[in-house]
């Protein structure tokens, strides 16, 4: 077989399309691999078709950015790069790996991914990794979900100053849980009198905090979901005790006081009027939702609260139609599960998604208490983890196994011959 490629001898990376094409001249490659001008045909064989959300951005992004450039650059400066990533995901612009069938010698392109949390495909994979990280860290005990919310009057602050305000929100949740556990604060009245309480906690909780910036209707609504272990570590670091009683009224009032005090410290006297209005309007504190039950299936609980932490605000299966100008999507209202349909122009849809774009390297999932890896007692507490969780379940998140699991198809087997394909070479980004 003189015209076939001896892929076992290939051990290089092609840096441009012409080098790649020249290499295969005289060999048995599909004539559709290249366009007439010699460029790589992005639609050849297994190049992934553009997803619907990526398609909407590709068709309308330039117009939207030109019209809203000042606002986008001010509030979401990483938007242009992230949008270009999702448009290029899985296509030739990010490069690809090429595999050859040793029987029929057909070739398959597997496009490189953008690895952006804003991408529906890569964001979902990011979420799966986060779920596995938490499952491997969490102790073999009951956990409970608590949701910390705030009134809509404060939402604009958290949009305009995202990183600073969201960090304050996380810190308020952390202080609230620790203060409830240790009675660091009693009432707002005593705080105003500056009564001192011991800042050294007698107990340490363990919990994961997850940022959600939207509800099912995609409106801006920043809030924190918490999965907390029904355990507390004693001050002498020797014993863990059960902790399964949560005073929800106290949580609501405590969270309000701590959050407003932190915001006041950050924003200064200009926030005093708003703070006083908040105390008058919300006398019972901010709404803290905490079901009086635990997650018996902890994995289900983790998957539930992480579903929005690593992907765009909407999944493509919720988009009912797109006619090139308007997007219609659906959702079930969280309160009564009533079905709703919403139609937005493409520009409105794009701007809605951009509201929830997370800044570079910003952590939307955080570990607190004895779940922090830097906690001095972490090595002792790790003994409480179910032994099964020591197994490396991340292997199931690898590309090949993920495709097998969800689509019952091996991407590295020839669709014609059903034999395992062999790695041929790689085209790098910019080639």
Predicted regions and their residues:
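Beta->alpha loop/short-helix hinge microenvironment recognizer with preference
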Residues: 1-431
């Amino acid at each position: 077989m003189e015209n076939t490629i001896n892929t076992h001898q290939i051990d290089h990376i092609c840096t441009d399309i012409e080098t790649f094409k020249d290499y295969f001249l005289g060999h048995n490659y599909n004539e559709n691999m290249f366009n007439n001008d010699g460029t790589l045909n992005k639609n050849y064989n297994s190049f992934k078709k553009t997803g619907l959300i990526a398609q909407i951005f590709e068709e309308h992004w330039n117009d939207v950015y030109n019209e809203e450039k000042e606002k986008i650059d001010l509030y979401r400066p990483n938007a242009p790069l992230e949008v270009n990533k999702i448009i290029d995901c899985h296509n030739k612009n990010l490069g690809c790996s090429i595999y050859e069938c040793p029987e029929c010698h057909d070739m398959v392109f597997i496009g490189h991914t953008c690895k952006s949390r804003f991408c529906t495909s890569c964001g979902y994979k990011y979420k799966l990794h986060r779920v596995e990280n938490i499952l491997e860290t969490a102790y073999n005990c009951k956990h409970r979900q608590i949701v910390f919310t705030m009134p809509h009057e404060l939402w604009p602050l958290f949009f305009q100053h995202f990183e600073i305000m969201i960090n304050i929100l996380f810190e308020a949740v952390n202080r609230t849980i620790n203060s409830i556990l240790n009675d660091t604060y009693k009432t707002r009245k005593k705080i105003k009198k500056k009564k001192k309480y011991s800042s050294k906690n007698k107990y340490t909780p363990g919990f994961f905090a997850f940022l959600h910036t939207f509800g099912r209707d995609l409106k801006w609504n920043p809030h924190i979901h918490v999965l907390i272990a029904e355990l507390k570590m004693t001050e002498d670091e020797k014993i863990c005790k059960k902790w399964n009683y949560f005073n929800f009224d106290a949580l609501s009032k405590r969270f309000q006081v701590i959050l407003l005090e932190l915001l006041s410290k950050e924003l200064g006297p200009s926030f005093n009027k708003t703070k006083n209005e908040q105390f008058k309007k919300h006398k019972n504190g901010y709404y803290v939702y905490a079901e009086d039950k635990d997650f018996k299936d902890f994995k289900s609980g983790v998957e539930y609260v992480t579903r929005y932490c690593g992907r765009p605000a909407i999944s493509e299966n919720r988009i009912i139609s797109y006619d090139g100008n308007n997007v219609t999507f659906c959702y079930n209202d969280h309160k009564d599960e009533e079905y709703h349909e919403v139609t937005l122009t493409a520009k409105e849809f794009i701007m809605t998604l951009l509201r929830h774009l997370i800044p570079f390297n910003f952590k939307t999932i955080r570990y607190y208490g004895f779940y922090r890896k830097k906690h001095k007692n972490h090595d002792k507490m790790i003994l409480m983890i179910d032994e099964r969780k020591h197994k490396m379940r991340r292997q199931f998140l690898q590309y090949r196994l993920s495709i097998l699991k969800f689509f019952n198809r091996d991407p590295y087997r020839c669709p014609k011959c059903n034999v395992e394909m062999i790695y041929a070479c790689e085209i790098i980004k910019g080639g």
